[in-house]
Amino acid sequence: DRPDFYFNLGATQDPRSTLIGNTHFDSKKGTYFSKSLFVEAIQTPNAVILLDELSRAHPDAWNILMTVLDYGQRYLRLDEQNGQQTIKVANGVTFIATANIGNEYTSTRQLDKALMDRFTIVEMDLLNKEEENELLSYMFPNVDSKVIESVATIAGITRVEANSETARV
């Protein structure tokens, strides 16, 4: 059982805050820096880190991730000034990313080739209704099976409609 962390990069408005941290001011402490959850995650040995919606992330996030994901480097600089702390990625940390790649997806960006080269690409088909029911039942064990079946049915109909020539979704 490995520690896991989830980061929705598509919803990140400020990549630096999400991936590095923030500077704060307190009248008693003065100015201080607080590291992000991402910094904690990469310092956690054997962690599994999910970078969701990588293709929706701001390019600044990609730039920050380049050295973190490069197997030959595996570090994060908190600041580019001399003498600033460099965070090494802990042993056994695994990164997994999701991305919707292609022109048919809205609000996505074409991923930088250097960034893509840091991953093994696995293309996945959509789940069929039975697989989707099974996954939803696993993820939401307290939800009634009839509700789960309805959600999977509606999702399937929505996907078919979205891909039709006369989409009304």
Where are the regions that the model predicts?
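C-terminal helical "lid" subdomain and adjoining coupling/linker elements of P-loop NTPases
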Residues: V160-V169
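AAA+ P-loop NTPase catalytic core and its hallmark functional loops
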Residues: D1-E149, T158-R159
